[in-house]
């Protein structure tokens, strides 16, 4: 339920708010897309935390660049 709420908020932002502002994200994928993917993979708490950390890095003093969501490690592989 919380996952759907967070993803819904991100969807509204991406669909209605982001198009009205100039592109300023220093990363690829964008911070909102990164957060959406992180929540999809890691759930609302860890994924949300990862998204917040990413957003806090998105400022003019950080070089930015390609920064995808890390793959989830398989705990059963040796």
Curated annotation (Swiss-Prot):
Single GO cellular component term: plasma membrane
PANTHER family: MEMBRANE PROTEIN INSERTION EFFICIENCY FACTOR-RELATED
UniProt function note: Could be involved in insertion of integral membrane proteins into the membrane.
UniProt membrane topology term: Peripheral membrane protein
Organism domain of life: Bacteria
UniProt keyword Secreted present: no
Entry keyword Cell membrane: yes
Keywords: Cell membrane, Membrane
Compartment annotation: Cell membrane
Designated name of the protein: Putative membrane protein insertion efficiency factor
Annotated family: Belongs to the UPF0161 family.
């Amino acid at each position: 339920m919380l996952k759907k709420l967070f993803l819904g908020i991100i969807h509204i932002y991406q669909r209605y708010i982001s198009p009205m502002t100039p592109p300023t994200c220093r990363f690829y994928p964008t911070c909102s897309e990164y957060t959406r993917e992180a929540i999809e993979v890691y759930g609302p708490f860890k994924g949300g935390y990862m998204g917040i950390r990413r957003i806090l890095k998105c400022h003019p003093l950080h070089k930015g660049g390609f920064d995808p969501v890390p793959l989830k490690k398989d705990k059963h592989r040796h």
